[in-house]
Amino acid sequence: CRERKPLGLLFLGGNPEFFKQGFAKVDVPSVLVTNRANNLPFENLSSVATDDIAAGKCAVDALFEAGHDKIGIIGGDPVKSYTSHQRYLGCKESFAEHGKEMNLEVCYEKARFSFDSAYRAMKRLVEKYPDLTAVFAMSDVMAIGAIRALRDMDYRVPEDISVIGFDGTVLAEYYNPKLATIRQQYPVSYTHLTLPTI
């Protein structure tokens, strides 16, 4: 950065807590994309982010409202992944609002954000929670991996087990069955607001 003298920087993902440790050395306007910077004390740092707590809650609310009360979750490690932790908090909030306890040992299965990892996580989840009727996968990629595992175990989706993903990817639109998903949307106005900052 020092040799090229950039006019601005974009930071993608990561835990915002890490910015507290090293961002003070950055002296150009910067934007943190996918995580919030509102609790970070840097005047030259802005952010564009999804409210992952609200998104996690929205996904699980939709499953409860569809009549499900045995809901499993496939997500990243909420201790190690900031985004997974935020979505986990939203899930927990939804469970509480619907009078249910979210027992991590039973209904939550950790996976990497990949088809294969989610496939294996779905198999583990069904083994420990055989009467579940719905799953929230914390990404569309995870949801597709989970659906493949369910089909390989002779479950029908959504007739036997409903699955909802997160991201709203194009792949979700064209997947068969069409994937229910929570869509991340960054309005065009964010781009117009952010680019002049940099």
Task: Give the positions of each predicted feature.
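Flexible loop/turn connectors
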Residues: 123-193
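Periplasmic-binding protein-like
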Residues: 3-13, 72-75, 129-139, 162-164
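Short acidic, glycine/proline-rich loop/turn micro-motifs
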Residues: 42-45, 75, 174-178
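Short acidic capping loops at alpha-helix termini that bridge into adjacent secondary structure
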Residues: 69-70, 102-106, 157-163
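Alpha-helical recognition/docking segments in bacterial nutrient-uptake
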Residues: 1-61, 65, 127, 131
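A short, hydrophobic C-terminal helix/tail in secreted or cell-surface proteins
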Residues: 194-198
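Hinge/beta->alpha junction and helix N-cap segments in small-molecule ligand-binding domains
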Residues: 47-58, 74-95, 100-121, 136-144, ...
